[in-house]
Curated annotation (Swiss-Prot):
Annotated Beta/gamma crystallin 'Greek key' domain residues: 367-416, 462-500, 512-556, 557-599, 605-647, 648-690, 701-737, 738-781, 828-869
Descriptive protein name: Beta/gamma crystallin domain-containing protein 3
Annotated family: Belongs to the beta/gamma-crystallin family.
Region ranges (Disordered): 132-159, 173-198
Residues carrying Phosphoserine: S122, S129, S130, S136, S140
Stretches with biased composition (Acidic residues): 180-189
Organism listed in the record: Mus musculus
Length: 1005
């Protein structure tokens, strides 16, 4: 996520003071582009986890120090390239940067040197150890010490020594000049009677990885990334539910007014936290999922007073929250290759007839579920949250003693239907007069609550898991609502975790279909539609037997229901799934009067909220691919007066925790609350609608063909090529997945092509072939490279050249007037049109050379040309040699700790990617594959970094399975191999014939 911040830059010219005021400096964008030096920053070499914990214990943050106590936070502009190096050599004693409480962050005998690149560049990690700097003789399995590895072995150490010698010389040469310059400027300032500090201001943008994604290590700690722990005390004067997540506090607000002060833009939860954390510097914090978790013992004691709780809590009346119901969905696949599956949307009292002899892969799309061993929700239980999980027959304890038994599934129950706040009550039995504690979020260590060992537990709302070990380890006990009082000993409840629903999702955005039922629970007469309905009474008027809407089933797409006709009034989002009665659409005060479907890029979402009614002015916040449950807690405020949706579809809520009235926000600008359908400026929470990857055995291409126009008549699904359509004549199409090539012939007797991209084609005219007979349908393979094409004025790709990377609606216009005679398609897929403005006959162009365009196409020349719009899809990248997947490891909240390696299939977001603009972007961290330091040398490691679009982040996949870097065609993705700890890490290497570790397969999700 990119969060711009305005900093007040002050250059300290007083060289007589020996106290160092800053350890970091940032360079302006102009100097970033031209600077050949980097910032040197010392940091502990080993045990990075110890470093992060020490950083958390300190009362100040390295990146966000307390501005009141550190006036010299230097976002300084270096006067020259050498001045920047000199400045950091001069401030080598990192332990003096902050007070004594913070010095432990930096004190280390063994130190590691990092290169911190300017904001648009990726980091270079240079280790003093020989294992890191000198490339292993086993760069990848089977190399066995190739000559190219040995030649580059000494490069890092030589570069490091060269930089060190240069910095020492610069220090000697410029030390005297720097002091003299400082004294002169100080004398001028004193003479003028003004402050000797020179104030500068610059707009700096920090690129922060998305901190909301918890990282799960490779062990069996399924909930190791859960970091949400808050409680509420039952004192009548206060309600201590704290709304926001700590990860959301990593957002910063920004002031577009360049004359505002630094502290005015930092008066948020961060500033308050830094102020209050000083009083607790002696206590140790806990880190979960890379996000700071304050010691629960500080403010979760029953004896604490309301005044002491006030910095950490917020008065909220849970009863006033109006929860929005949501549908559930779970898909059960056969474990070993069979295409058999079962889709579950509601409770299944008896599932014993379902056959999964080898086990099942269960994908929970939405909601939380409980599997039972026996019918009617009896027997052993298994809790499932959103995500994938493999279950074999051993999920039942008794089956482990009887290997001959098959996989058993008795019944299924859905336990969460909205985003309501979970509440569990802990009441000490030894002290009846003591106030009970109400917990709302995960507690990794219940012992830190300092509650008696003998405690009674009551679940007020939601479903909770009680673990016998801290940090959510061991066999959990399921605690459900309305099941009375639980008597649990301290040994059985060391940590607590509530089940919670995930974000808004859509699986098949183009598969638009809704079925209306006359009665609740999907009974009575039905009506279905797949287009906008601006008036439900008019739509139902033709069916006299249909008397109102009792229940709704959304087959595909994401829809909005409106309280009034013509898409006005209150709004309610309809996700894919079942809405069994009117309470499922309880957000609307009246019946549904109109429906509308939503279309957008659901992979990348970006929005800006403004506190001013004038766009691009005042305080605002940028949000990318992240949901925020409490905008007030991050310091933005409760009122939003204008909105700019840059991409995706967002849902804003009138209340916190995604409760209350909903406002659907599509791409565009909203200048006041009337524009988004609100009754006031109040918006307290917001979240995007995101594309959900499909499960295993789902088709990568899907097209629905209809025998009549307007999606009427007989319907046939196509998932692969059909070479003969003589027995079925399609008249309209729904292209749901992938792109397709339609082959047809007209009266001239020649075959022609027509490309169908993802979308809806109500008739053949919308396809581009109004009077034609369709003969064949062919899916078009996905490509993972940026499009590039060259048109030539002479045959055989000679003469004047017109190079294109984007669409041109007229090649023959007065500006270009290019008469194409030959074509060289360098990369990507292109569509050539005979006429201008993408009209007329079409031809799909794949990478090759066409020496004579007229002989190839039968056209005189090209009228217009554009790249084919490949649909946005999620993918997994599998290494052929190791049969393992490209995986993100480390903490997504800290780019320095993240690395890229290969590991076995896990089903987690850390193995899911998507390709756009030449970038492979991780779904877990929203960062890109990046060659560390941009070194175009074999053996350079590949890491993750925020998108900056430079060549080191761009990749293309060739047809032979190699993934090459835009830095050089002679650099391809490889696995390092060898016997060291980093043997599974990914590097770039020279392409070698027959080297299977350099071959990758793309799995479309």
């Amino acid at each position: 996520m990119s969060v711009p911040v305005v900093y007040d830059k002050r250059r300290n010219l007083d060289c007589r003071e020996e106290k160092e005021e800053s350890n970091l400096a940032f360079v302006s964008q102009d100097e970033q582009d031209s600077s050949s030096f980097t910032i040197l920053y010392e940091e502990p070499l080993q045990e990075e986890d110890r470093y992060t914990s020490a950083e958390l214990r300190g009362s100040q943050s390295l990146l966000f120090p307390d501005t009141s106590s550190m006036p010299g936070l230097a976002c300084e502009r270096s006067e020259s390239r050498t001045d920047l190096v000199h400045h950091f050599e001069k401030e080598g004693k990192l332990g003096e940067a902050f007070d004594g409480d913070n010095s432990e962050m930096f004190l280390s005998v063994e130190a590691k040197r990092y290169k911190i690149y300017p904001l648009a560049l990726s980091p270079i990690y240079e280790d003093d150890s020989s294992q890191e700097d000198v490339l292993s003789s086993e760069v990848s399995p089977g190399h066995h010490g190739s000559s190219k590895s040995r030649e580059s072995a000494n490069q890092p150490s030589s570069v490091l020594s060269l930089l060190q010698s240069v910095s020492e010389r610069l220090q000697r040469n410029f030390d005297g000049d720097d002091r003299q310059e400082a004294e002169e400027e100080e004398e001028e300032a004193v003479a003028s009677g003004k402050d000797w500090r020179t104030e500068k201001r610059e707009h700096v943008t920090f690129h922060l990885p998305d901190p909301s994604i918890p990282f799960y290590p490779e062990d069996n700690q399924e909930h190791a990334g859960i970091f949400k722990s808050y409680v509420e005390f039952s004192e009548p004067t206060t309600s201590s539910l704290q709304h926001g997540r700590w990860s959301e506090k990593e957002l910063f607000l920004q002031k577009s007014d360049m004359t505002s002060k630094l502290h005015s833009s930092l008066k948020s939860a961060y500033h308050q936290y830094l102020q209050t954390s000083r009083t607790h510097s002696s206590e140790t914090g806990t880190r979960f999922g890379g996000t700071l978790q304050e010691p629960v013992s500080k403010y979760f004691r029953v004896q604490d007073h309301a005044g002491r709780l006030s910095p950490y809590v917020e008065n909220v009346d849970k009863q006033t929250l109006k929860c929005n119901p949501r549908p559930g969905k779970m898909i059960i696949y056969d474990l070993h290759g069979s295409k058999y599956k079962q889709e579950v949307y509601c409770n299944i009292p008896d599932a014993t007839t379902w056959s999964f002899p080898n086990g099942a892969l269960i994908k929970v799309v939405r909601g939380c579920w409980i599997l039972y061993e026996k019918p009617h929700f009896q027997g052993q239980k298994c809790v499932l949250e959103e995500g994938e999980r493999v279950l074999d027959r051993d999920w039942l304890l008794q089956n482990r003693k009887h290997p001959e038994r098959n996989f058993v599934l008795g019944s299924i129950k859905r336990v969460l239907k909205d985003c309501s706040i979970p509440v569990i009550e802990l009441c000490p039995k030894t002290d009846p007069g003591c106030s009970p504690i109400y917990i709302h979020r995960s507690v990794p260590n219940v012992e830190e609550l300092n509650i008696p060992k003998s405690t009674s537990v009551t679940v007020k709302s939601g479903v909770w898991l009680a673990y016998p070990d801290i940090h959510f380890k061991g066999q959990a006990t399921i605690l459900e609502e309305d099941q009375g009082l639980f008597e649990i000993s301290a040994a059985e409840m060391k940590s607590l975790h509530p089940l919670q629903m995930g974000g808004l999702k859509v699986e098949m955005p183009m598969n638009l279909k809704v079925i209306l039922y006359e009665k609740p629970h999907f009974l009575g007469h039905t009506k279905e539609f797949s287009e906008h309905i601006d008036s439900v009474p008019t739509f139902l008027k033709s069916d006299k037997d249909f008397h109102g809407i009792g229940s709704i089933r959304v087959i595909g797409g994401v829809w909005v229901a409106y309280e009034k006709e013509h898409f006005k009034g209150q709004q309610f989002l309809l996700e894919e799934g079942d809405f069994e009665d009117s309470s499922a659409c309880g957000a609307l005060s009246g019946p549904i009067m109109s429906f509308r479907y939503l279309q957008a890029n659901f992979i990348e979402s970006s929005i800006t909220l403004f506190e001013s009614s004038h766009l691009e002015s005042g305080k605002f916040i940028d949000i990318t691919n992240q949901e925020i449950s409490d905008l007030e807690e991050i310091g933005f405020g409760s009122e939003t007066r204008s909105i700019h949706v840059k991409s995706g579809v967002w849902v804003a809520y009138h209340q916190k925790f995604f409760c209350g009235d909903q406002y659907i926000l599509e791409k565009g600008k909203y200048k006041c609350f009337f524009d988004w359908g609100g009754s006031s400026n109040t918006i307290l929470s917001i979240r995007p609608i995101q594309l959900e990857p499909l499960g295993i055995n789902e088709p990568t291409h899907l097209l629905k063909a209809f025998s009549k126009a307007g999606f009427q008549g007989e319907c046939i699904d196509f998932v692969k090529e059909c070479a003969d359509l003589t027995s079925f004549t399609p008249a309209s199409f729904k292209v749901l997945r992938g792109c397709w090539l339609l082959l047809y012939y007209q009266e001239d007797g020649f075959y022609h092509q027509c490309v169908l991209e993802e979308g809806l084609y109500v008739d053949l005219t919308s396809c581009g072939c109004p009077s034609a007979r369709i003969r064949a349908l062919q899916p078009i393979d996905y490509v993972f490279e940026e499009p590039s094409i060259s048109l030539f004025a002479l045959e055989h790709c000679e003469g004047r050249e017109l190079h294109l990377e984007d669409a041109v609606n007229s090649v023959l216009n007065k500006d270009l007037h290019f008469y194409t005679q030959s074509v060289w398609i360098k990369s990507g897929l292109w569509i050539a049109y005979e006429g201008s403005n993408f009209l007329g006959r079409q031809i799909l162009l794949t990478p090759k050379e066409i020496p004579n365009w007229t002989a190839f196409s039968g056209w005189k020349t090209i009228g217009s040309v554009r790249p084919m719009k490949q649909p946005a899809v999620y993918i997994r990248i599998r290494n052929r040699a190791q049969d393992e997947y490209l995986t993100v490891t480390g903490n997504p909240a800290d780019a320095r700790t993240m690395s890229v390696c290969i590991s076995p299939y896990s089903g987690k977001d850390t193995q899911i990617w998507h390709y756009c603009r030449g970038l492979f972007k991780s779904k877990a961290s929203h960062t890109c594959l990046d060659v560390i330091g941009g070194r175009d040398t074999p053996g350079a490691k590949v890491a993750l970094w925020t998108e900056h679009g430079q060549l080191r982040q761009k990749w293309r996949m060739s047809r032979n399975g190699t993934i090459s870097s835009y830095l050089s065609d002679e650099l391809v993705l490889d696995v390092k191999g060898g016997n060291y700890y980093d043997k599974t890490h990914v590097i770039v290497n020279q392409p070698l014939e027959g080297e299977e570790t350099q071959k990758w397969d793309i799995e479309i999700l």
